[in-house]
Design a protein with these regions (language model features):
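A short core secondary-structure module
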Residues: 2-3, 7-53
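Short Ser/Thr-interspersed hydrophobic loop/turn segments at strand-loop and sheet-helix junctions
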Residues: 26-27, 42-48, 71-74, 94, ...
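C-terminal helix-coil-helix/basic helical segment that borders enzyme active sites and/or dimer interfaces
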Residues: 120, 124-133, 147-203
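Cytochrome P450 C-terminal beta-domain/meander region
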Residues: 1-7, 164, 199-207
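Glycine-rich phosphate/cofactor-binding loops in nucleotide/flavin-utilizing enzymes
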Residues: 87-105, 192-247
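Buried hydrophobic positions in well-ordered alpha/beta secondary-structure cores of metabolic enzymes
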Residues: 6-8, 24, 41, 69, ...
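Tryptophan-centric aromatic hotspots in well-structured domains and transmembrane helices
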Residues: 12, 21-23, 40, 64-68, ...
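Glycine-rich beta->alpha junctions and the first turn(s) of the following alpha-helix
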Residues: 50-150, 220
Length: 247
């Protein structure tokens, strides 16, 4: 017929509890290689065979989910690309996603400015913490990284505009943004000292803004492909190094 019956489970699906449709990558034939025989569907999430279970993060928020498919139905009309050609579609989606994540360099620059303001407001012995040489050194290092990420993003975006589609360079953008964001919010907690451990109404600075973003930043190094995957991609496809021995 014109429909596919799908069973399986997917963990860490972002915002599935809001979605009417989700990209689904499913195996539809054996294939000669592990990435062959895969098809990409645009799955209807509002059908009886789809169950979405929440995953509550350590910051108390609910962004991620487990999705269970029990005889879920997908139709030929919901296939993206061709049957058994889903790997190519998936790679294209990931490249677009990583380029989109890389665009967070602009918010990273704003967050750095907020971090500097925090360092000006936090005092130690009535002296702003930003006056300490080691703090200024760490802030300078973060500034260099954020500016480097921004310039690299502009370079990769320029190439993308020329060729008409995102490339593997998106892994660089994604890696830089994820790791720099985590480092920035870790520095914010460090600057606050023991007050950085306070939560919500007890937080002295920003009503837990820094604490919540610090906790969430760890997930940013996982979602959209872990930092380790990005490093392997950069090493193999940009630097031309040998493949990961574990593959």
């Amino acid at each position: 017929g014109d429909k596919w019956i799908i069973n399986g489970q997917k963990v860490w699906t972002s915002f599935a509890h809001f979605a009417d449709r989700c990209f689904l990558v499913a195996r539809t034939s054996k294939g000669e290689k592990k990435h062959h025989g895969i098809t990409c569907f645009l799955l209807d999430m509002n059908q009886p065979g789809v169950e979405v279970r929440p995953i509550i993060q350590m910051d108390g928020e609910h962004d991620f989910n487990e999705v269970y498919l029990n005889d879920a139905v997908a139709y030929d009309s919901e296939i993206i690309g061709a049957v058994d050609d889903g790997w190519r579609v998936t790679i294209a989606l990931l490249m677009h996603e990583r380029t989109g994540i890389g665009a967070q360099v602009f918010s990273l620059e704003q967050q750095f400015n907020e971090l500097v303001e925090l360092a000006q407001n936090v005092t130690e012995d009535n002296v702003p913490i930003i006056e300490k040489a080691d703090v200024r050194k760490r802030l300078l290092n973060l500034y260099i990284k954020s500016r480097g990420s921004l310039l690299n993003y502009y370079r990769n975006l320029t190439k993308q505009l020329k060729v008409g589609h995102p490339g593997v360079e998106g892994s660089m953008d994604k890696l830089f943004v994820s790791e720099n964001t985590k480092e920035l919010f870790a520095e914010a907690i460090s600057i606050q000292g023991h007050q950085g451990l306070l939560w919500k109404k007890d937080a002295i600075y920003g009503d837990s803004y820094w604490q919540k973003n610090y906790l969430y930043s760890f997930g940013q190094t996982i979602g959209g492909g872990t930092s380790e995957i990005q490093k392997n991609t950069i090493a193999e496809r940009i630097l031309g190094l040998p493949k990961d021995i574990g593959k």
